[in-house]
Regions:
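Conserved beta-strand hairpin/beta-sheet module of binuclear metal-dependent hydrolase folds
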Residues: 2-48, 160-172
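Divalent metal-coordination and catalytic microenvironments
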Residues: 7, 22, 32, 47, ...
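Residue-level detector of beta-strand structural context in well-folded domains
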Residues: 18-20, 131, 135-137, 159
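Short loop/helix-cap segments at secondary-structure boundaries that form the rim of catalytic
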Residues: 23, 69-74, 141-142, 162
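Metallo-beta-lactamase
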Residues: 28-29, 35-37, 138, 145-229
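Active-site HxH/HxHxD metal-binding segment of metal-dependent hydrolases
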Residues: 41, 45-134, 138, 231
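Accessory terminal helices/loops
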Residues: 114, 200-202, 213-274
């Protein structure tokens, strides 16, 4: 995993989210877990080489941030916002997150099939959150503090984790850096407000949900992208297009092709932009 600062590590180059961990004087804090089984097992082993895992924070409920919790059972207390806990691995008519996660195995993690749980076994204990809260929460562990900031927009229970001692924020999918932004079921107005809130943090580096480690500049880039997207949708609505035609129009435009879709998500483009 990439060493972001002296005590912060993140993975930014595999299918799924950018999971991270932070080493403190009293143990390790995990922030999101890998979607791919072998990566989850490897991350746990690497993190535990620095000390006991005390907390696992999930920044949202999308499967690429939480599926790997299964491989961290017995390793720390799982923490999440109430809206994330309420939607944790929920099967909907649109998507079964368990099946979606398994689709990545043949192409991205064939060795993961050997440690893949059947669906019944998985749902018996997917390692759900047990510290559940609304608003913000601060966790202190050893010589570090972790400010869990509610940043709704991408999902209702979205969190950013600010570690002031490292001058780093792990912001989850509030930033997509250099890859197509996943807008499915998002509240873009809330998202913009959350970006403005994160601008106030005193940080040198940001770990985004997808794409390379970045700086506060990418908060402005993400905001500009969302504002431009709103304008494109408003323009399509003003021309009398239906929702379906609006999605089709934007999908076929240069605007939606500005960034590539993140690793392994090419076939999900309709969900990304809808």
């Amino acid at each position: 995993m990439e060493k972001v600062t002296k005590n912060v590590y993140a993975e930014t180059k595999v299918r799924g989210c950018n999971p991270a961990y932070v080493v403190t004087s009293s143990g390790v804090v995990i922030i999101d877990t890998p979607q791919l089984p072998t990566h989850a097992v490897r991350m746990r082993k690497e993190a535990e080489s620095h000390g006991e895992i005390k907390y696992l924070i999930n920044t949202e409920y999308h499967v690429d941030h939480i599926f790997g919790n299964y491989y961290f059972r017995g390793a720390g207390i799982v923490v999440a916002h109430a809206d994330t806990a309420n939607n944790f691995m929920t099967v909907t008519p649109e998507i079964n997150p368990y099946e979606y996660a398994h689709e990545a195995i043949p192409t991205d993690d064939p060795e993961g099939e050997k440690i893949w749980p059947d669906e019944k076994t998985y749902f018996e204990d997917p390692n759900r959150p047990t510290i559940i809260f609304k608003g913000d929460l601060t966790i202190r562990l050893g010589d570090h503090s972790f400010e869990l900031i509610h940043t709704p927009g991408h999902t209702p229970g979205q969190l950013a984790v600010y570690i002031p001692e490292e001058r780093v924020a792990v912001v989850g999918d509030t930033i997509f850096n250099g890859v197509q932004t996943w807008l499915y079921a998002s509240d873009v107005d809330q998202w913009i407000e959350s970006l403005d809130r994160l601008k106030k943090l005193d940080v040198d580096k940001i770990v985004p949900g997808h794409g390379p480690v970045c700086t506060k500049h990418e908060l402005d880039v993400q905001k500009a992208f969302l504002l431009e997207w709103i304008a494109a949708v408003q323009s399509a609505i003003g021309r009398g297009l239906s929702k379906e035609d609006c999605v089709r129009h934007i999908k076929d435009s240069e605007f939606s092709k500005r960034f590539s879709v993140d690793i392994g998500q090419e076939y999900m483009l309709d969900h990304v932009i809808e």
